[in-house]
């Protein structure tokens, strides 16, 4: 008989919660400068120590057994707050820009496929997809059922077949992640290539990658997550050859493709 023994280095979590005063004291001990501790306490009560930790991290020693001491003696708590506020404004600008991209992508996919198939419910046609049909239908169904839009309620109250609303309704309410998955799952044909060209790209795979990357960035913005100095899970493909050149080869070669600037 073979006995399987699972080895683990995990330990119990024993850290205790800190009061606001203790949080200030902890940061002071590590070298952060406070000009007004009462004001800092108010910020910590509104923003949280843990959320701000992401903005102090780059200025601290962060080795395995380090004390997370600040590497510079001139970093003030106000500098961290300024960085946090900058990131918040940056997220707002990014989110507004993504809105334009998202609306354009939804519109083009729906219009091109509805027009070419003559089918209001074309997205239900399994023959249009190269993989992931069942999972995609589950995602679309869940997103539509979760929607509180009046036009979805109107369709459900008036029609019983097909059970799903037409593409211009259903794909209007699915998440951008679901929309990205739909585009990626579609078979490669002239319609998909045409949509890609509308965004100035020559390769469908690049638009698929961009939609996936933008979807991740959108989620960060929507959930108020840090975007400054973040390493994203999906690396962006930066093409050298586009319909409308926007960056020279040297610059492209210097960009870290899992950082915000690439997205």
Model features per residue range: what roles?
Residues 2-263:
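Long, contiguous internal "core" modules enriched in hydrophobic/ aromatic residues
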């Amino acid at each position: 008989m073979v006995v399987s023994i699972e080895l683990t280095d995990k330990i119990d979590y024993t850290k205790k919660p800190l009061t606001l005063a203790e949080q200030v004291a902890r940061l002071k001990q590590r070298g952060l400068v406070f000009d007004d501790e009462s004001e800092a306490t108010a910020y910590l009560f509104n923003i949280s120590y843990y959320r701000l930790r992401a903005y102090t991290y780059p200025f601290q020693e962060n080795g395995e057994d380090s004390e997370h001491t600040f590497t510079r003696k001139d970093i003030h708590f106000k500098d961290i707050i300024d960085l946090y506020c900058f990131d918040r404004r940056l997220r707002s600008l990014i989110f507004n820009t993504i809105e334009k991209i998202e609306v354009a992508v939804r519109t083009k996919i729906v219009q091109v496929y509805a027009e070419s198939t003559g089918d209001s419910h074309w997205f239900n046609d399994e023959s249009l997809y190269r993989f992931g049909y069942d999972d995609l239908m589950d995602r679309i169904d869940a997103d539509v059922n979760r929607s509180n839009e009046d036009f979805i309620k109107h369709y459900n109250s008036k029609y019983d077949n097909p059970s799903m609303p037409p593409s211009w309704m259903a794909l209007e309410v699915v998440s951008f992640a679901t929309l990205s998955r739909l585009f990626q799952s579609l078979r490669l044909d002239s319609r998909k290539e045409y949509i890609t060209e509308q965004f100035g790209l020559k390769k469908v795979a690049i638009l698929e990658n961009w939609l996936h990357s933008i979807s991740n960035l959108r989620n960060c913005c929507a959930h108020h997550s840090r975007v400054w100095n973040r390493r994203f899970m999906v690396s962006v493909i930066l093409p050298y050859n586009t319909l409308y050149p926007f960056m020279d080869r040297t610059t492209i070669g210097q960009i870290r493709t899992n950082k915000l600037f690439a997205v």
